[in-house]
Structure formats: C-alpha cells, structure tokens
C-alpha cells in the first residue's frame, strides 16, 4: 500500500449526502480488492473498458460518499484511504460504454460489488434497480433489452465490506494427508448441522456448528480424513426460486470468490473469522478442508440477469460472449454464462482466489465444479490450456489437493481420465459401473474389475496413481444411497419443474417396490445392497468419497436434484443414526478396515503378474 504522504482530495462528491470526504492517497494497484494493513485500506479494482471508476463508501444510514479513483496502472484503478477501517461498507461505480452489441455493459447507476470482496452485507431485492434494462420491455422481447433505465441500485443490492485480515492461527498446520490415505466426506454446511441434536441451536447451519465436537467426533468415527464442503463462496439465491418459495440450497451460484457465504455464519459480521476458526478446529483433529469451487460461471446469469459486479465492471473481459452476437453469452454450464478463463485478468482472479483460500483461510484443496469449462480455450476442452499451465507452475496451488469434476454440458465436455498429472478426478465411470454391477447388469463384470483395482485404463498412461480416481457411488447430485436402492424413477415434483429436472437415467434398482415399504424381505435386501456398495467403495483402490448421510441411509424421498430444497428433505436427519445403527456401525467397521490395511489403498497399480506360490519361490 502507498506511503506517499501527499494527500490528494477527490473532486467527486456524489450526491452530497454522505460525510465529509476522507483523505485519499494514490495507493497501489496490488493487491486487488480492499486491503486493510492496520493503518488504512488500499482499494484496487480492474476494468479495462472503464472511463472512470468511483469508490463508494456507505455509512450506517445508507448514505454514500463517492471518491474518484484517479490512479490507474495496468487497467487497475486504485487509492489508499488511511481513515478506512474494517467494517466499512463500500462498492464501485464504473463509468464507460453501455453497448451490448459490442459486448460492453457499463452502468454507473449500479453500485457494483468488489470482485475481490472478502465479505458482503445486505440482501438483493431483485427489483428493477438491479437490472440494466427495462424489465417490462424484456418481458415482451427478451432479445431486445434496450437502453438501461439508470435506476440506482444502492439500497437494493448488497455491499462489500472491508475485513480485518488478522487472525490468531496459533499452531495451525495443514494435515497434508497423502491421497492414498484419504477418505473424503462430502458435506453441506447447513444440511450437516441443521438438525444435529448435539449442536447448540444457535450454531446449527453454520461454520461454527460444523466445527462443533459432536460433528467432528462423527467424522472421526468414520475414519474421515477430509471434509469436502459444497460451495461456501458467497452466492446468490435465484429470483425464480425465491418466487416459488424455494432457495438455491446447494450454492452453485457464486458472485464472491474470496468471501465465505455469510448466511452460514452464526455471526454475519464475523464470517471470515468464524470460517478460519472452523478450519483450525478441523486441522486440530487431523481433518483436511476441501472446498467445492465454482469458477466456471457467476450468479449474474445471461443477458437478462442482474448487474451486480462482473457484468458492469468489464463484461467482455469476464465472460465468454457469442462470437456472432456479443449481446449474448456462451453457456457451457447450463447456468446462463461462462467465465472467460482465456482472459489474463480473469485467470488472475481465479488464481488469486485459490491462493487466498490456501494462504489466508488455510484450506487444503479444491474440487472444481464443471472443470472442463476452465479448459476450453476456444470451443474444445484443452488439457494444455492456460489455466492448467498456471496451476502446474504455481508453488502454492500445485501443492494442495486438486479434484476435477471432469465434465460440463458443452460438446466434448466429458473428460474423465483426461486431466493433467497433478489432478485427481471424480470418476464418473466408477460410479456408473458400480451401480450397474450391484443392480445386476452382467455385462459390467469386466469393467467392474477395472474400477475395483483403481481404473488403470484411465490414469496409468498419464503417470498418475490409483489415488487419482476419486471413487464415489453417490454425491450431492443424484440419489442418496438409500434412494439408489429404493427408487427406479426420480420424484422431483417438489422442485416446481413438473419433474423435468434432474437425471432421468439413474442406474438404480428399487428392489421390487418403488419407495418406502414394510415388506421385510425388501427392507433386508435394500440394507444388504447398501452394505454391498459401501464395502465396494471402501475396498476399491483409489480415493473414496462418502456423501453425507449415506452412512445412516439418509433419504430425499426419491428427489435426485435437491439443489433448491433448503428443508428437511435435504438436511441430514440425525435420528437415523439410531434407526439405522447397523448400517452406521458397518460403515465405521469397513472404513477402519481400509484405514488399517494398506492393501486396500495401494500407491501403485497392480502389475498384472502371476502370484508366485511358496513352491515357486
């Protein structure tokens, strides 16, 4: 940050309703975002297309003071304000072209959130103020959104918040568990804790609740070495879902890649410190923290989405636009837009975010949602893309766990087995083969043997080990283990899409009756099938992943897409620990068997050589 003592007073005073202008120094173009150093705060924001950028300080009454950022280096607009301390709410206004046919959507009537914001406050109201087009006109013709109505979004949007970066990590150290010794447990912060009787009510659904000894003891009883958290970056609830009385429960709708989602904090004013405290608690028990991250798209959606940060900052830099009509967005993700990982600044944002979560928040790895999108240099998935090059060379990110969801919805997006050497992958072929085998598909026997022994056909040729295969049979997306053996068809009516959402081909078998039954033979068969699948998962070569609640037969009543169900349908029902105590005990035994016997977690593939008998030695 700047140490230049010559104070520069801004000329811009905005609407004049805020307090007197603070002292402003030139500051630095690095680091990006708002950085408090103990004496003041440096602000830095990127926009290549901007003609002017204003820093907007918001007081407790919602009044705004605008300060022109007159210093620009490498398209980064910056200033240092010695009077600004943690807790200060702020945003930016970007003046520049609003020309959608050219790919530009600057709108200074929008208070923009900091792309590097470490914390956020407030709510979105999804009124006209959030949108840079006439919503009534767009309802008539969605392709022609016209000129922006210039309705000020202050008071209708969230604000960024300056944080205190200092934290007592004590003697915290990363566990650094080797892959071949790792057992991953995929969990949802709220779903894991919302009904846990051992977690104090005021901590349920929070980072503090997840770090409660009652939860950690459960994980340790399962011999779990890493908890993989579904998205905890700050995300938005979709307007459509809110209108249906639903919510974006899963959280794959990020707009803040540096901020822990504040609705998971018991104290929203201290979300960063609470997240760090959670990580420290897990590390004390030898459990790694892996984040499910969504760097493939943002919450702003397509051309009809709100303008909350990236779109108004520099639309063409942050997003992939259609080559033949720059008004519209390429959509490899099924969400309305795709981040432009070809642009150097967007790549910088992704890498800066990853490094921040490792160095400042002490997380131990990442699972990349729809990772194939990050590898699309043009249209095809390219394992030599700039993103993979940067990860390979980065001295911090290359040393943590990197897990790819190796597909997206674009053409050629299914890339299981094709990621570079540092990466592990959610092995979708393992999932499909194990499901088919246990529902009685005889043709799968040969492939089942390959999956059981580490999927060498997918990973050995690229120099990877069996642990590159993240083995799973169920995950957040799809049936739970209980539902996999209880339903032939999805039952997603509660999602408000007439059961048209979610995967139709589930490779499931209901054992004779659709849904719940009192038939003792079917109940016994289902219990045996669940044990078969858990045993297969834990005794296969590779790195196993358990989906939260499967160890006690959690059900979603046949709903295989609970992305919008923030309710008892998706939360863990901890009473099942008693009801299904036999399955829980079995899971604990088989995970311990894996942990105790290295033969189930070999570091190398089987060589395929005949076993010599004693007479041949």
What spans do the regions from the language model cover?
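N-terminal structural segment of carbohydrate-active enzymes
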Residues: 2-265, 280, 467-506
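Structural preference for beta-strand elements that scaffold enzyme active sites
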Residues: 182-186, 226-228, 286-290, 365-367, ...
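Aromatic- and carboxylate-lined catalytic core of secreted/periplasmic carbohydrate-active enzymes
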Residues: 92, 576-607
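Substrate-binding/active-site clefts of carbohydrate-active enzymes
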Residues: 153-154, 188-362, 370-393, 413, ...
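Extended hydrophobic/aromatic segments used for targeting, binding, or gating
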Residues: 220, 239-257, 554-588
